[in-house]
Amino acid sequence: MKRISLTQYLIEEQRLHNNIPAELRLLLEVVARACKTISHAVGKGALGEVLGTAQSENVQGEVQKKLDIISNDILLEANEWGGHLAAMASEEMETIHQIPNRYPMGEYLLLFDPLDGSSNIDVNVSIGTIFSVLKAADGMQAPTEADFLQPGSKQVVAGYAVYGPQTVLVLTTGNGVQCFTLDREMGSWVMTQRDMQIPANTKEFAINASNARHWHPPVKRYVDEMLAGTTGPRAKDFNMRWIASMVADVHRILNRGGIFMYPADAREPDKPGKLRLMYEANPMAFIVEQAGGAATDGQQRILDIQPEKLHQRVPVFLGSKNEVELVTSYHKAK
């Protein structure tokens, strides 16, 4: 494959589809640069004294890792001065982050999970960053949380970075899904996969099976049928994969198919799932759909959900289209 940089790809996309104006290109280049900085911090590990907890909790009530806070600060500081954003929101912050008055205000809203899978940090398992870009309302002067509450179908860009054996950046601007790999010697993002496609059928599924006793009947039925293998109703064997890092699980599914499930369960009836809609489920759903897959909450398309609050949680079923449609049909039939 000819070496195509991220910048070249964005410029050519604008020429072909007129969907990446200069401000949006700047935003994506800044986010990509911030991901390089995070990758460098992750790569240092104990040598950089960035492992362990920070003795604090985020808005979700989760104990923060040092790298959670570092990654959040990197993304905020990289993006607030460029003039391309109206405001930002993060998993690590209870309220939105306003652009300081000394900087010009742009026309986009950026949401992110700065370090997904951070429970894996100390054991050297792949983690990543997830981000979503929305358009701000015309003439916006003082952004509020309500301005972020747009359905996922309104996203103009979604992407994630995986910090693993290689550092990769996967994104969609609404015209397919592209993967860029960080050339560590040159410091540049180089396209390594174009128009990624998820196979419609699969023999792999990803779910935290330790919660099986709490699953609702549709999820239990679906997983039990897969576990029955060739002697069961599916008449084929399945393998289970679970990394406990959404970016790593989804990246595997993008490359070789599969279904990722994080359902609601009976432990906390008032909590509809664990994953956050705005900066986890929505961007991943946009990417998966653009790669030919499907993404639902068990009842409806994730991208059609109208958010009610910034840190809203949802059940998630995404990946190979036929499998997502099957488990969704079990939910609708209950």
UniProtKB/Swiss-Prot annotation:
The keyword Transmembrane does not apply. Substrate binds at D116, G117, S118, S119, N208, K274. It catalyses: beta-D-fructose 1,6-bisphosphate + H2O = beta-D-fructose 6-phosphate + phosphate. One of its GO terms (molecular function) is fructose 1,6-bisphosphate 1-phosphatase activity. GO terms for cellular component: cytosol. The keyword Magnesium applies. Its EC number is 3.1.3.11. Binds 2 magnesium ions per subunit. Mg(2+) 2 binds at D113, D116, E280. Pathway: Carbohydrate biosynthesis; gluconeogenesis. It holds the Pfam family FBPase_C. One of its GO terms (biological process) is fructose 6-phosphate metabolic process. Gene3D superfamilies: 3.40.190.80, Fructose-1,6-Bisphosphatase, subunit A, domain 1 (3.30.540.10). HAMAP family: FBPase_class1. Homotetramer. Belongs to the FBPase class 1 family. PANTHER family: FRUCTOSE-1,6-BISPHOSPHATASE-RELATED, SEDOHEPTULOSE-1,7-BISPHOSPHATASE, CHLOROPLASTIC. This is Fructose-1,6-bisphosphatase class 1. It comes from Janthinobacterium sp. (strain Marseille). The lineage of its organism: Bacteria, Pseudomonadati, Pseudomonadota, Betaproteobacteria, Burkholderiales.
